[in-house]
């Protein structure tokens, strides 16, 4: 992650929304450069760390929050749950998301794990912590990203436009108080990981329910179709 001004790293709407934590973003860039200087790598690659904030702030209608990036080298791409198009096999959580997607919407299983089309259509795929040390899950929790992503979540919720937050798992459900401002609905279920998917994630219909909540608030539904 390069030492550049926030408005050079993210979309203009996000630059304004994240202005209260601009110094924290700078500090996190310094932290990551110090990690590299000490011989410790991080994921995703530098240009993708803030990728979730490169899509228009004003167009976000769905928020899906992950915990931290995939720690497997080659998997994390800066969007929660998404992987690069060539990744095989898919992470188990993403495979379960796709199974529910197919069951809920009746679409065929996607050909790859790239969720970029969702991000382009107004789905914010945000990890609570934006980086991780390879093969070391949760290694960057408590380092400072939480303040940045809390600011992002609160800024989204405070807009005067409808949004639905899809909260998978207990960690995500703790974010609900941040969504109290504005016209924001939420859908909660167990996490899609293999440890909990069978306890209520499967059958939860998050995609169709989110669209029902959006249209009920006068907003356009999301086109969830993936190639």
Curated annotation (Swiss-Prot):
Gene3D superfamilies: Uracil-DNA glycosylase-like domain. Its main location: cytoplasm. Keywords: Cytoplasm, DNA damage, DNA repair, Hydrolase. The keyword Hydrolase applies. The active site is at 68 (proton acceptor). It is found in: Cytoplasm. It holds the Pfam family UDG. The keyword Nucleus does not apply. Its EC number is 3.2.2.27. It catalyses: Hydrolyzes single-stranded DNA or mismatched double-stranded DNA and polynucleotides, releasing free uracil. It comes from the Bacteria. Excises uracil residues from the DNA which can arise as a result of misincorporation of dUMP residues by DNA polymerase or due to deamination of cytosine. Belongs to the uracil-DNA glycosylase (UDG) superfamily. UNG family. This is Uracil-DNA glycosylase. It comes from Mycobacterium marinum (strain ATCC BAA-535 / M). The gene is ung.
């Amino acid at each position: 992650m390069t030492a550049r001004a926030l408005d050079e790293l993210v979309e203009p709407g996000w630059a304004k929304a994240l202005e209260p934590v601009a110094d924290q973003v700078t500090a996190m860039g310094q932290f990551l450069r110090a990690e590299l200087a000490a011989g410790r790598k991080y994921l995703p690659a530098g240009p993708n760390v803030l990728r979730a904030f490169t899509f228009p702030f004003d167009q976000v209608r769905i928020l899906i929050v992950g915990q931290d990036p995939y720690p497997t080298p080659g998997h994390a791409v800066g969007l929660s749950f998404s992987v690069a198009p060539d990744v095989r096999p898919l992470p188990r959580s993403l495979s379960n998301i796709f199974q529910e997607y197919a069951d809920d919407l009746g679409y065929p299983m996607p050909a790859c794990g790239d969720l970029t089309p969702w991000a382009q259509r107004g789905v914010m795929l945000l990890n609570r912590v934006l980086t991780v040390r390879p093969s070391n899950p949760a290694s960057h929790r408590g380092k400072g990203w939480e303040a940045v992503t809390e600011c992002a979540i609160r800024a989204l919720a405070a807009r005067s436009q409808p949004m639905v937050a899809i909260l998978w798992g207990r960690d995500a459900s703790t974010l609900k108080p941040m969504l109290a401002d504005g016209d924001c609905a939420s859908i909660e279920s167990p996490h899609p990981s293999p440890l909990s998917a069978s306890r209520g994630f499967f059958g939860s219909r998050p995609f169709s329910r989110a669209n029902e909540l959006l249209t009920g608030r006068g907003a356009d539904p999301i086109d969830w179709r993936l190639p």
